[in-house]
Amino acid sequence: MKQYKAYLIDLDGTMYMGTDEIDGAKQFIDYLNVKGIPHLYVTNNSTKTPEQVTEKLREMHIDAKPEEVVTSALATADYISEQSPGASVYMLGGSGLNTALTEAGLVIKNDEHVDYVVIGLDEQVTYEKLAIATLGVRNGATFISTNPDVSIPKERGLLPGNGAITSVVSVSTGVSPQFIGKPEPIIMVKALEILGLDKSEVAMVGDLYDTDIMSGINVGMDTIHVQTGVSTLEDVQNKNVPPTYSFKDLNEAIAELEK
């Protein structure tokens, strides 16, 4: 197995499943730290701040720092502020997205007369929120969605994800959003900029083919699939472009790296 200078690592289905740590997750991060290999946690979760993500990982005894976390909310805020500094935004989403947009100098409004409509996972979504978002897009606001995941793994099973919520506005308006998170290149380019490395020197680690693995493939990066989440070995082997590697878990990846 190739030795990489850095790793981009998914969270849900790779580091943990809901509130449960996945076997090999802590060991993999400890291995990288001992070797002095940089890594970033790249997640489509827009509901949490980097500090909240870090706290969850630390509760599982997985080493993490806020500056090592790249969320779809952060990438979304950067994308908008680079295009339109100080723009007005109507958003659906949690505290992670709200904080990211505000700290980027964007103005959050509660009506449809805005420059951007941004949809992130909103566990308190209502018809009225969707109505305002729909009217905003119809009024000409640029339509952004933090990530396309139609479902998310939770302890109860696969629940509706942000892509499912986004589809309501998209179907109603006939307008397709610009997605920011995996598998789009936008969030991956942001992570590579933080690392200061070329894509050939970095590998993407994740469980879900359609987002994690495709995000690496879409930017020309090697990919490491772990069979600890949604996509099985059979799933990824049958794809036109399979991952560079597929392991039962991250313990198996460590064993390969140590050869």
UniProtKB/Swiss-Prot annotation:
It is an enzyme of class 3 (hydrolase). The keyword Magnesium applies. Its cofactor is Mg(2+). Gene3D superfamilies: HAD superfamily/HAD-like. Its EC number is 3.1.3.-. CDD domains: HAD_Pase_UmpH-like. GO terms for molecular function: metal ion binding; phosphatase activity. It comes from the Bacteria. Transmembrane segments: none annotated. One of its GO terms (cellular component) is cytoplasm. Keywords: Hydrolase, Magnesium, Metal-binding. Coiled coil: none annotated. The keyword Hydrolase applies. In murine kidney infection models nagD mutant was attenuated in virulence. Belongs to the HAD-like hydrolase superfamily. NagD family. Catalyzes the dephosphorylation of 2-6 carbon acid sugars in vitro. This is Acid sugar phosphatase. The gene is nagD.
